[in-house]
Design a protein with these regions (language model features):
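Phosphate-group recognition and catalysis centered on beta-loop-alpha active-site segments
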Residues: 17-160
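Bacterial Sec-dependent N-terminal signal peptides
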Residues: 1-27
């Protein structure tokens, strides 16, 4: 009888032993499964442009930071350079977010890459504007990516 009572007392603890990530370690797939689970009681957290309070928005460092925080979805913005490279940038120009000036669509990727990103307060950093490919390599299997500004580049995004 005593063993039976201990067994029933321990049953609720088994419910806490659920696996949140697949055995493969693909956290992004687990998040997508969670989103599609109508019985889920979990809150899914999304980050707009990454950890832009501590790093330049849409930068690799901002993405790495939110992954480290356990954020589930990274929302990013895309623009296309003059030489057809998809880069992470919210604005039509690079004026606010980098040390450079001009419209993204009028500048080559090589020229943009020479600029440094700025913080939200306009302070220059050592960070550079990443390409979509670079960002996706960082995010792969670790966080779900939501492309916010990028529908006009749909086919190019799929190619990456």
């Amino acid at each position: 009888m005593k063993k039976l009572l201990i067994l029933f007392a321990c049953l609720p603890l088994l419910g806490a032993c659920t696996q949140t990530e697949p055995v493969s370690g693909n956290r992004a797939a687990a998040i997508v499964a969670e989103i599609h689970n109508p019985r889920s009681k979990n809150v899914v957290v999304a980050s707009h442009r990454g950890d832009w309070r501590n790093y330049p928005e849409n930068s690799i460092a901002a993405i790495e930071s939110v992954i480290g925080m356990g954020v589930d979805i990274m929302e990013l913005d895309l623009k296309l350079t003059k030489d057809s490279v998809l880069v992470l940038c919210h604005d039509r120009t690079i004026d606010r977010t980098t040390s450079g000036k001009g419209r993204v669509c009028d500048i080559t990727y090589d020229s943009i890459r020479r600029c440094v990103l700025k913080t939200g307060h306009g302070v220059k950093t050592t960070h550079r504007m990443p390409t979509l490919r670079e960002a996706l390599e960082v995010c792969k299997d670790r966080i779900v990516v939501n492309v916010d500004q990028g529908y006009e580049y749909y086919d190019l995004v799929l190619a990456v």
